[in-house]
From Swiss-Prot:
<keyword id="KW-0165">Cleavage on pair of basic residues</keyword>
<comment type="similarity">
    <text>Belongs to the teretoxin M (TM) superfamily.</text>
</comment>
<dbReference type="GO" id="GO:0090729">
    <property type="term" value="F:toxin activity"/>
</dbReference>
<keyword id="KW-1015">Disulfide bond</keyword>
<keyword id="KW-0800">Toxin</keyword>
<feature type="propeptide">
    <location>
        <begin position="22"/>
        <end position="34"/>
    </location>
</feature>
<feature type="signal peptide">
    <location>
        <begin position="1"/>
        <end position="21"/>
    </location>
</feature>
<protein>
    <recommendedName>
        <fullName>Teretoxin Tan6.1</fullName>
    </recommendedName>
</protein>
<keyword id="KW-0964">Secreted</keyword>
<keyword id="KW-0732">Signal</keyword>
<dbReference type="GO" id="GO:0005576">
    <property type="term" value="C:extracellular region"/>
</dbReference>
Amino acid sequence: MATSGRLLCLCLVLGLVFESLGHPGARLPKDGKRAVSTRHAHDDPFAHEVNCGGFPCMFSCCENDVCMELNCEYFPSLGQ
């Protein structure tokens, strides 16, 4: 019984620690700016992003407006 109580306390403490490390939920900070820049994919020469029906597909191909990661008939080269 004592072991299960200790395990429960450990889980609660770890939950509080991990919650305090970042923003809880998917909301923006109060200044309206994102905490992490989304331009890192555009700066990486090896990143591959395809516009697929208005949604970006990273490291995959777009067939019939659906992101496919397997069974791609055509996969554009990274140099384009």
